[in-house]
Amino acid sequence: MTHTQIHRSKWQRAALVLLLGSMVQTAFAAVINVSAQENLNDALARAQAGDTLKLASGTYKTKLYIDKPITIEGPADRSAKIVGDRSGRTVAVHAPDVTLRNLTVSHSGMSLPAMDAGIYLEETATRALVEHNNIIDNSVGVYIHGAAESMVRENKIIGDATLRVNERGNGVTVWNAPGAQVVDNDISKGRDGIFSNTSTHNTYKGNRFSDLRFAVHYMYTNDSEVSNNISVGNNMGYVLMFSERLKVYGNIAVGSRDQGIMLNYVNYSEIHDNVINKAGKCVFAYNANYDKIFANHFENCQIGIHFTAAIEGTTL
């Protein structure tokens, strides 16, 4: 046997071991029913990787620290309520391949510097799936703190409207989470709907935003997509800053008190097929270079397009 054949054989054996391990884990995965009278943390401690905890309707007054790949799922009406104690993170995920589905998650701590959140996805929580939940009355709704390839979709996220806007958390905060997606959520009454910072290859699409400061707020997020979102009655719609190679299309902003779209140091990007209706300025561009802005519909704005500072190579 040649050296190449030996090397290939070793890789094939390794791949087979991984496949068999995955099959064994799947074969032995259990569904564990949990009632609201039980201790949810005890059930979580007993669960093995790959298991599903199916929560009955009711209130679970606890905080969760998830350190194994499992699924926690409630009834379709989201009547399984995980209620925190107003400190820290109500649900903190630190393992990969965790799914949270059909839950109501509330009462996180309210410290912005401490990154308190209803659901917190740590860097190790790669490929997390957060779907079909009510995430209400928290600081940040979902904090994606480095969890690459995570998905947050079809959730209802409502902030604490009793606080001043700048004291509230964002609906979803994304920090350095390559490939993370935020899709088809309804986000309201927070500070920003989605705040994306220092990340790349993200997709934010199909979301609805209302009663916020900014619908989408970008900082240092490159090679990403903002598409088919709806912003209604926010201070500003899509605030995109210090980012490159963005695709911004199919979005709607209605009733923005200031700007529908803001481009601040956004370069080499495409902004097209967006609808801006009723804003102070439909588009405000500051030092936005080599962008392509085309096929947009602007209506009922005091100023249609306002360019300032150095604008080079941008086409309209």
Report the location of each language-model feature.
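N-terminal secretory signal peptides that target proteins for export/translocation
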Residues: 1-10
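Bacterial N-terminal signal peptides
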Residues: 14-26
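Right-handed parallel beta-helix/beta-solenoid
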Residues: 26-42, 57
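Extracellular beta-strand-rich solenoid/capping regions of secreted or surface-exposed proteins
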Residues: 41, 45-49, 60-73, 81-126, ...
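Parallel beta-helix/beta-solenoid
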Residues: 48, 67-68, 77, 86, ...
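Extracellular beta-strand/beta-solenoid scaffold signature
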Residues: 83-92, 113-122, 137-144, 164-177, ...
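Soluble, non-transmembrane catalytic domains of enzymes that act on hydrophobic metabolites at membranes
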Residues: 281-284, 294-316
